[in-house]
Amino acid sequence: MVKSHIGSWILVLFVAMWSDVGLCKKRPKPGGGWNTGGSRYPGQGSPGGNRYPPQGGGGWGQPHGGGWGQPHGGGWGQPHGGGWGQPHGGGGWGQGGSHSQWNKPSKPKTNMKHVAGAAAAGAVVGGLGGYMLGSAMSRPLIHFGNDYEDRYYRENMYRYPNQVYYRPVDRYSNQNNFVHDCVNITVKQHTVTTTTKGENFTETDIKIMERVVEQMCITQYQRESQAYYQRGASVILFSSPPVILLISFLIFLIVG
């Protein structure tokens, strides 16, 4: 009981200190942003005057109001008013926007294969009665007790699955039941899917595959069990009255 009170007081002090630091707001520094003293380039109104001679319609060396070396009002090296490398109008360099976009990095392209793989991992597989597909694993290194099977596995491991099908661990009373069910559904699905592609498995393949999948299912059970207990511990922690009171007080301080 004493330890519980001590832990509650420590948590209260920690949250109070954290909230005090989080509520401190930085005051903006006086002055403007970068280069507020005026531009050093032509035609931009520097208070101290430009360092270049006054120009009529265009920039330095421009007869017709364009950028440097432009006869007809475009960007640098543009004959017809477009971005650099664009002969007939447009935006900034290599794109249809303004010149302010020249230095913007291009947006990374989304790899749809990675998105699909991330969505499939841990998701419920349709048509399999609530089974989920685990994340990809490295195939385990297994010794089968004889040189022939060891060599056969090394040469053919790419033909065996690197993901397993499983149900949530809370549906099983122990690890053995989870692993047994996981092995059966994974081997069945892999053999059926691969057979439809014209590839057949021998008895040696099935024997080795069952051993490999068994090790992967054990690993999957350990991962799921650890995550399950962590979720349970988090629920117990945040459902206790002292923690609820402290969280409510913290929200009040932030919102207020």
Swiss-Prot record:
Q: For binding Cu(2+) 3, which residues are annotated in this chain's numbering?
A: 80-82
In this chain, the stretch annotated as 5 X 8 AA tandem repeats of P-H-G-G-G-W-G-Q covers: 54-95
Q: Where does Cu(2+) 2 bind?
A: 72-74
Q: Where is the composition biased (Gly residues)?
A: 55-97
Question: What is the membrane topology noted in the UniProt record heading this document?
Answer: Lipid-anchor; GPI-anchor
From which residue to which does the signal peptide run? 1-24
The residues bearing each sequence repeat, given as ranges, are 54-62, 63-70, 71-78, 79-86, 87-95
Which residues does the propeptide include? 234-256
Q: Which residues bind Cu(2+) 1?
A: 64-66
Any one of the GO CC terms: plasma membrane
Some GO term, biological process aspect, for this entry: which one?
A: protein homooligomerization
Q: Which domain of life is it from?
A: Eukaryota
**From which residue to which does any coiled coil extend?**
none
Question: Where found?
Answer: Cell membrane; Golgi apparatus
Q: Where does Cu(2+) 4 bind?
A: 88, 90-91
The record's principal subcellular location, in a coarse class, is membrane
Give the positions annotated as glycosylation sites: 184, 200
Keywords from UniProt, A to Z, are: Amyloid, Cell membrane, Copper, Disease variant, Disulfide bond, Glycoprotein, Golgi apparatus, GPI-anchor, Lipoprotein, Membrane, Metal-binding, Prion, Repeat, Signal, Zinc
Q: Which cysteines are joined by disulfide bonds?
A: 182-217
Which disorder is it associated with?
Found in high quantity in the brain of humans and animals infected with degenerative neurological diseases such as kuru, Creutzfeldt-Jakob disease (CJD), Gerstmann-Straussler syndrome (GSS), scrapie, bovine spongiform encephalopathy (BSE), transmissible mink encephalopathy (TME), etc. Scrapie is a transmissible neurodegenerative disorder of sheep and goats. Most sheep that contract the disease naturally die between 24 and 50 months of age. The incubation period in sheep depends on the strain(s) of the infecting pathogen, sheep age at exposure, and the sheep genotype. Scrapie can be spread between flockmates, or it can be transmitted from an infected ewe to its lamb.
Q: What else is known?
A: This protein is produced by a bicistronic gene which also produces the major prion protein/PRNP from an overlapping reading frame. The alternative prion protein/AltPrP (AC F7VJQ3) and PRNP have no apparent direct functional relation since a mutation that removes the start codon of the AltPrP has no apparent effect on the biology of PRNP. In mouse and hamster, the alternative initiation AUG codon is absent and is replaced by a GUG codon.
Recorded domain comment: The normal, monomeric form has a mainly alpha-helical structure. The disease-associated, protease-resistant form forms amyloid fibrils containing a cross-beta spine, formed by a steric zipper of superposed beta-strands. Disease mutations may favor intermolecular contacts via short beta strands, and may thereby trigger oligomerization. Contains an N-terminal region composed of octamer repeats. At low copper concentrations, the sidechains of His residues from three or four repeats contribute to the binding of a single copper ion. Alternatively, a copper ion can be bound by interaction with the sidechain and backbone amide nitrogen of a single His residue. The observed copper binding stoichiometry suggests that two repeat regions cooperate to stabilize the binding of a single copper ion. At higher copper concentrations, each octamer can bind one copper ion by interactions with the His sidechain and Gly backbone atoms.
Q: What does this protein do?
A: Its primary physiological function is unclear. Has cytoprotective activity against internal or environmental stresses. May play a role in neuronal development and synaptic plasticity. May be required for neuronal myelin sheath maintenance. May play a role in iron uptake and iron homeostasis. Soluble oligomers are toxic to cultured neuroblastoma cells and induce apoptosis (in vitro). Association with GPC1 (via its heparan sulfate chains) targets PRNP to lipid rafts. Also provides Cu(2+) or Zn(2+) for the ascorbate-mediated GPC1 deaminase degradation of its heparan sulfate side chains.
Family of this protein: Belongs to the prion family.
Q: What is this protein called?
A: Major prion protein
The organism is Ovis aries
> The organism's lineage?
Eukaryota, Metazoa, Chordata, Craniata, Vertebrata
Identify the gene encoding this protein: PRNP
